[in-house]
Each structure stands twice: as C-alpha cells, then as structure tokens.
Amino acid sequence: MNAVGKNLKQLRQREKLTQDALAERLHVTRQAVSSWETGKTAPDVETLMALAEALEVDVRALIYGPEVVAEGGYP
C-alpha cells in the first residue's frame, strides 16, 4: 500500500465512510476507491483535490498523512 492509499483509507475510516459511500460522493466506482487504497492505481491531482474536499481535509493530509499535517511537519 502506498502512502496516499494508506492515508486515504485512514481518513475514510475516520469519517466512518465505506468505500461505497466515498465512491458515491466522488461519482466513481467502489473499485476505483479500493484501487487507490491498495496502491494498484493512484488518483490524479484533480481527484486528490476532490478526495480532500469529500473528506474535509487539506490535500496535504492525503499526501503526507493526517498526523504530519496536524504537527506541521510537512515540507
């Protein structure tokens, strides 16, 4: 699992969303969300922005992790 996928899964679960529920918010398939979380594929920049909006986080939380962003430790 890549960093974005791991962070995506963590943030999705924190919001108590299923993959299906997140997929509906983004108008994509559940399989797309699963592929991002497992690292089989990576969301493009536009999708990263939509994910951040759907999860109500800064896009950097998806890239660097919510803990790093909360501590101000991102580059």
Segment roles from a protein language model:
Residues 1-14:
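A short, Lys/Arg-rich alpha-helix, primarily the initiator
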Residues 16-35, 50:
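Short alpha-helical DNA-recognition segment
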Residues 38:
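Short, conserved catalytic or interaction motifs in soluble domains
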Residues 46-61:
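DNA major-groove recognition helix of helix-turn-helix/homeodomain DNA-binding modules
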Residues 63-75:
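Short, charged recognition helix plus adjacent turn
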